[in-house]
C-alpha cells in the first residue's frame, strides 16, 4: 500500500459517497467543477492524463483483435502522454503543463486503453508511481467492466481511504444488441455487476456512455438514463457519437449510412437535456460532449468549443425550465 506523508492529511476528503442533490436555479445539474470544489475545498484540482502502456482484451486476441468499432485511442492522448515515457515523466510533464495556480493539485488520469488489464502487481506499481508526487492527490482509472477482479478492488478500496480514487467504466450502451454491433465484447449485465462491486468497496465509480450509437432510437437512448440511474454511481460522462477516421465504424458508415443519426448541436442539446431529466439527481455529470481532434474527426462538425456547447445547453435548460432528475423514478 502507498505510504505517502500527505495521505493522513488528505484522506478525510476522499471517502466514497454519492454527491448530494446540488443543482440550484442557477445550476440545473450537478456539474463536475462544483463536485471537485466540494471534495477538494482547499485547492484547485486538474486531471493529468497518463498512458501506462496497457492494451485491451478486445485488441490483443483475448476477446477480439479488432477493438471496438468506434475506437481510436490516438484521439485523446496529449502530446506529453506517450507510453514510451515513464509514468513519472508523464506525470511530471503533465503537472508542468497544467500548472496555473499556486497550490494546485492533480488527479492522475489513466485514460488510454484498459487500465486494469495487467497483473495486479504491475497495476499497483504504476498507480503508485503516479501517486508518488506531493501534488497528486488521487487517481482516475479508465477501464472496461470485464477487466476487474476482487483482489484489485480490495486494493483500490484500501487506497481510497488515503487518496481520491475513481474507476471509470466504459459502459457505452445498456442495449446488448448495440454492444454486440460495436464489438464491445461484454454485455450490460457485466457493466452493472462491475459498477455494483466497485461501489461496494467504497470506490467512486463513473459510467461512460455514448449517445447516438448506430441503430438506437431516441427512446432507446433515453432508456439508458433510466437503467443507469438505478446503479450506485458517483458520476457519469456523456458524449455524442463521433465518426473517427481509421475506425471500423467509419467503414460501416461508408457502407451503411442509413444506420447512423448524427445530430446538429441544437438537436443534441435537446437530446442531452431529455436524457438528464431522467438521470438520478444525485449523480455528478462530468461532461456532455467530447471533441476529438479535427484531423481524426469525420462527423459531426459543430464548430463549438466544449465550454461554448455547455453554455448553450445551460441556456436551453433555463428556457425549458427543467433540471437534472426532473423525471427520475427510483425503482
Model-derived regions, located:
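Conserved C-terminal portion of the radical SAM core fold
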Residues: 189-249, 266-289
